[in-house]
Structures are given as C-alpha cells and as structure tokens.
Amino acid sequence: MKGSTSLYRKVDLIDTTGATDIANTDYDGAKPVAPGGKLADGVVAAKLSPFLDINDNAQLNRFGLHNGAPNDKNNLSEKWEAMGLVPALDPANPRDFFLIVGNDNDFMTQDGFQAGSSYKEESGADLDTRLLVYRITIPALAN
C-alpha cells in the first residue's frame, strides 16, 4: 500500500509444468531454495502469467468502486483473501467460469454480533465484507 492506494492486487496463473518439485527435499525444510535471490542450481521455477488486475480503476469505476483516494466506502480495502472458481455452465463457452474474489471485514464493524452478544469495533471503523465477481475464460492448456 502507498497511502490508500494498493500497489499490487492481482490474480495470476501459475504453470507448474517442468517446475522442480521441492517436496520432501532439503529445500522443503531449512535449506534456502534461492540463496541471495537466485534459484539454486537445478531448481526450475514455475511460470507466472499475469491474468487479472483487480486494481484496474477503469473497470472498478464502472461499478462505483476505486483503488486509492478518497479513502471512502468505495475504496477497495487492503486484504483480499478469498478466491473461488465456479463454472459458468454455458454450453457455447465451456471454458467460461465465474471467479469470485472476496475480503472480509476483519470484525471491523459498528454493528457486529459475536459469541452471543453485540459489539462495536473500538476505532469506529466500519468495513463492509465485499465480493467481486468476474466472468473469465480460462485458456486451454498447451499440449
């Protein structure tokens, strides 16, 4: 974050084909896999492809939302911690899915109910739980 602006909030595609499986190796414990920021010899990284930039203000603005000032109810909060993928079930577009990205309010509310009683967050903060839903096409895997 820089002020109220998130610098990185993205969904990326990761291809593990050809990547080194470090499970049950020395790298699966205390041995660093990238000492000094360089992968150890013989270790091949997974491939990362940028897919969706949640911070895209042009798209957020279409729905009255934004990334950055003013820090109001329509500014996306900082932590987006949930993701789900649901098939669109569209026979004409079988690779289409709904990507649901969400964040909770971390109990920062003025109208909460927990453990059998009402509460108000001490700082006065009142954050909404929010879900963003995208219809996406997942690219076919290369053979």
Question: Where would I find each of the regions flagged by the language model?
Answer:
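Sequence/structural signature of beta-propeller domains
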Residues: 1-143
